[in-house]
């Protein structure tokens, strides 16, 4: 996955960004197995540039913002289903994540769910993991990512628990537009679209459970 491609304004227009982007693209292609893909979330204004490098548009990932005045109520049916993610065996978390992300990322997940000033929750249903999410404090407010869930009910319960972490400030959620249930969740909670990126792939789009992706991990990391 390619992300975080920025050139300082005083160095733009000199071909440095173009050289850097093509060098990074070539390096990633050299590391991949034949037939593997590269994904990215690119700003809309640069979509035509990435297309010239072979990347094909898949869908939009949209950043939503909400001001969280107080901890949202957890649906009564979900009480007891939302648990600290540390209560779930890590192998179960890793297996669930693998259905929503196209590569194993055990080392990353261990660090991501245990990062300071963050909260990681799981949704347990009928003795199995039915979703998980992480919220972390950032430069402005808090950001949820990822938010993976079997269905809208599980996502709603997780969102309620995670949003409470941001009470008193803004909360951001990066929603894939190709999951209507995720878009509905954002609108149901009065979230406002403030930014967006084009998800693009060089090579075939990965076979993941898009219906489970209610919030991507980050625009930089997929």
Could you say what each language-model-derived stretch is?
Residues 2, 37-42, 173:
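Conserved hydrophobic beta-strand within the GNAT/NAT acetyltransferase core sheet
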Residues 4-6:
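Non-membrane alpha-helical segments in proteins
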Residues 8-14, 22-36, 47-48, 84-222:
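Intrinsically disordered, low-complexity, positively biased terminal segments
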Residues 19:
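Short alpha-helical segment within the catalytic ATP-binding CA
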Residues 35-41, 56-70, 193-205:
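Conserved catalytic-core motifs of GNAT/GCN5-like acyltransferases
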Residues 58-60, 75, 102-108:
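Short, structured loop/turn "capping" segments at alpha-beta junctions
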Residues 67-87:
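Conserved N-terminal entry element of GNAT/NAT acetyltransferase domains
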